[in-house]
Amino acid sequence: MGSRLHVQVIHGGPPLPYKDDIRAFGKEYAEQLDAQDPLRRFRDEFIIPSKKDLKRKTLFPNDGMYSCGHPICFANTSCACVHAAETEETSDEKCIYLCGNSLGLQPRSTRKYIDHYLRTWATKGVTGHFVPHDDQLLPPFVDVDEAGAKLMAPIVGALKSEVAVMGTLTANLHLLMASFYRPTPERNKIIIEGKAFPSDHYAVESQIRHHNLDPKDAMVLIEPEDLDRPILDTKYILRVIDENAHSTALILLPAIQFYTGQYFDIQRITAHAQSKGILVGWDCAHAAGNVDLRLHDWNVDFAAWCTYKYLNAGPGGMAALFVHERHGRVDIEQAASGKEAFHPRFSGWWGGDKQTRFLMNNHFVPQQGAAGFQLSNPSVLDMNAVVASLELFNQTSMAEIRKKSLNLTGYLEHLLLRDPQTENSEKRPFSIITPSNPAERGAQLSIRLQPGLLDRVLESLNEDAVIIDERKPDVIRVAPAPLYNTYAEVWRFAQLFHLACDKALCGRK
């Protein structure tokens, strides 16, 4: 495992509460864990889809009418019908939603934030950019990016100046690589994993081609040594780095691998690569809001992530990036004299110094830090959705979220592998390809089914209103989110999953 100061070392701490306790396989035990959960109040801050919601063919019940007969209208959120409908909805049986690694659930406050934005735009027009209001949830439009950065920074272990909430994930990776990938005849390779998320692969490949290089020569793929165990051991990654050290300019790896759920040793890999003169970037899409990151302390050069997974900002929500403070410094005196004063980057007006931004003098001096990498003014609509969720995260800490996540996912693993009826691995129709060491994974468990079972298992789970994620041909990804998932849900999922496997096996015979 190496020297991993950034994770809770399970084996060195007290035993998890469900170990060696036969009661752990009962519903009452799971409910007891929920009663003792210090984060349990956060579940009420999210809208959990009901079984009726999932099966309904329309977005609104009663053909767009409330049960009172009034038409649904979200423009008037003070209408008694709206609140009555919300009260009625909570009485429906909720689905089991274990898919926060794909799309997080909607915070209840999201609508309030967006309503405030719409009202500001409607009643203030362009003055909404600059005029503060006593009842505002966010500052005027011109300053919303600062509000997002302030809330995001502690979630990824960064200084506020090192974070910018902006753009989309792949676009941000391109911007960062345009700045940090500076190939020379001697050093022009980029090292990535062989099974990287396709968009990352495409981005790296196109960056190499952009510099008139051939990916066959300049792209190093770290492939799993054992296809039956698609995990990249840290020592193996370091060996690949050593083998290519003198010809490599950049490394881009995922903090957490999207398919296996493996949590890479960011601190160790970063330090090792940098000791060889290589810049290191991380795709934190599956890590932000999931594990307790320390991007500043680990000396990461740059990172990027989306906000629609564990950060619950909605489909395609605004992304974010990190640039370590040593790369974000701007020498104002040098810039004033026209000399090179900051790290090279693609530039846009919103990244310019706020004091001179509106002078329109075509002399670009970036803001200090990651803010200087911004291009255009951010979508205030999207920023409100981001901030609505980040406010919840800032009511606790990533250390507390990670602590519950370790227990919650560990409990799920325990129920799947240690159930007396399925403990015999030879008879079990599935295996878990995610690392068994809790320090080497996030919330997600990737479960590989025997060939031919996936569709039948998914059909059964769908009938029971269980929402998880699939990866063809035979893997499901299950990710309990600590802010809104419960131990009782995990227990119920394990029961339904075992039943689904039994049905699938019977159907195959």
From Swiss-Prot:
Q: What Pfam families would the database entry show?
A: KYNU_C (PF22580)
Q: Look up keyword Cytoplasm and say if it applies.
A: yes
Q: Where does pyridoxal 5'-phosphate bind?
A: L169, T170, F197, P198, S199, D200, D283, H286, Y308, W349, N377
Q: What is its main location?
A: cytoplasm
Q: Which GO terms describe its biological process?
A: 'de novo' NAD biosynthetic process from L-tryptophan; anthranilate metabolic process; L-kynurenine catabolic process; L-tryptophan catabolic process to kynurenine; quinolinate biosynthetic process
Q: Where is the signal peptide?
A: none
What family does the Swiss-Prot or TrEMBL record give for this protein? Answer: Belongs to the kynureninase family.
List, alphabetically, the PANTHER family matched: KYNURENINASE
Question: What protein name applies here?
Answer: Kynureninase 1
